[in-house]
Amino acid sequence: MTTSPILQLLLRLSLCGLLLQRAETGSKGQTAGELYQRWERYRRECQETLAAAEPPSGLACNGSFDMYVCWDYAAPNATARASCPWYLPWHHHVAAGFVLRQCGSDGQWGLWRDHTQCENPEKNEAFLDQRLILERLQVMYTVGYSLSLATLLLALLILSLFRRLHCTRNYIHINLFTSFMLRAAAILSRDRLLPRPGPYLGDQALALWNQALAACRTAQIVTQYCVGANYTWLLVEGVYLHSLLVLVGGSEEGHFRYYLLLGWGAPALFVIPWVIVRYLYENTQCWERNEVKAIWWIIRTPILMTILINFLIFIRILGILLSKLRTRQMRCRDYRLRLARSTLTLVPLLGVHEVVFAPVTEEQARGALRFAKLGFEIFLSSFQGFLVSVLYCFINKEVQSEIRRGWHHCRLRRSLGEEQRQLPERAFRALPSGSGPGEVPTSRGLSSGTLPGPGNEASRELESYC
């Protein structure tokens, strides 16, 4: 069997890659021509060995040369192994190693081979260092998303249970909190569903991979939708705040329906096409790797657009806020401090931090820049939900006032109930009309008008945000 000229060229290029790996480590080795000759001799010996061997009578995986190593016939439901190919420039380091591959129950070879024992050991040191960094980043974002999930759930309950906090602004906050929670839950669930085969791909590891593949891809789709919804709700926050400060008139309740449609409907417009194209043209593994960058840009482009629009809204809001502070004739130091505080408050709400590394694509991020981009984005994205819940719920003056009022009413109801249980029956008849067990006298000074609602002026809304 002869090798075509095109295949020879491809093989020479791949073998040059092996030489480059060796050159990077500072070792001596053969030229590309010598390495190709060694590979060609290894291939011929493999074919001669397989031709001389007698095929097994029963079901078995066929012996073959997979362009890397020579495989003998293998029994079904077993893990075959072959010695590391001797044409490798670093073969003397890995002579005792093996390449592993699964032979399925149907007599077909599995898709994956494990050649980690045959890799250049000097090259593996850099790989292990990178893997350690990625594992630490995963621990960091797991802690961040878990903390965000817990605080967001509590903030969501507070904004939902206290009726006096119900207004368009807080309805949008509730949906934003929900999108952060869905994003955190989806990412944490995806990590659980993503199989992690060990260095030796045995029967059990491959079976677990095949069983979890469908669930893992489903989790990947849900994750992409939740991430997209999170960005669109950040955009809704920016559009709503900008409309309060710039636009005049209009029904907030009517606009809220459009906000709902934008926040939860827009992500489907780019996630569904991505799923279709990915299934047709890059249906590999768990869809966690993006080898075809054009397909990944179907999702990346709308997200970058939301980041850019929110950044422009952020700049516009800062300009409006600065003009308002100056018209109040505040001292220079006072309005600068107020502007700085408002800026830091708006950054997590609008996701402005995303613009720092937005121009840097995955293709451009290499080496230290790649890890700097990953660390910056992963840290802020995972803890962003926690920051938003703290800034716009837990330390919000309206929320704190309502919690104190609710706690005061709860204690008052409890004390009234205890007093009424101790009084004789005639004491109940002496109570004023309209009072009774479990009822709390209300004060007109605590009317709902004391809290900013949908009809308040834009300046008061800005105060509540900043």
UniProtKB/Swiss-Prot annotation:
Q: How does it sit in the membrane?
A: Multi-pass membrane protein
Q: Which GO terms describe its biological process?
A: activation of adenylate cyclase activity; adenylate cyclase-activating G protein-coupled receptor signaling pathway; adenylate cyclase-modulating G protein-coupled receptor signaling pathway; cell surface receptor signaling pathway; desensitization of G protein-coupled receptor signaling pathway; endocrine pancreas development; gastric inhibitory peptide signaling pathway; generation of precursor metabolites and energy
Q: Which GO terms describe its cellular component?
A: membrane; plasma membrane
Assigned keywords, A-Z? Cell membrane, Disulfide bond, G-protein coupled receptor, Glycoprotein, Membrane, Receptor, Signal, Transducer, Transmembrane, Transmembrane helix
Q: Where does the record say this protein resides?
A: Cell membrane
Segments for region (Disordered): 427-466
Query: Per UniProt, what is one GO molecular function of this protein?
Result: glucagon family peptide binding
The UniProt entry, under SMART domains, shows: HormR (SM00008)
Q: Which residues are glycosylated?
A: 62, 77
**Which residues face the membrane's Cytoplasmic side?**
162-169, 243-254, 320-341, 399-466
Q: Signal peptide span per the entry? A: 1-21
Instruction: Please give the subunit comment from the record.
Output: May form homodimers and heterodimers with GLP1R.
Q: Which family does it belong to?
A: Belongs to the G-protein coupled receptor 2 family.
- What task does this protein carry out? This is a receptor for GIP. The activity of this receptor is mediated by G proteins which activate adenylyl cyclase.
Write down what this protein is called. Gastric inhibitory polypeptide receptor
Kindly list the organism's lineage. Eukaryota, Metazoa, Chordata, Craniata, Vertebrata
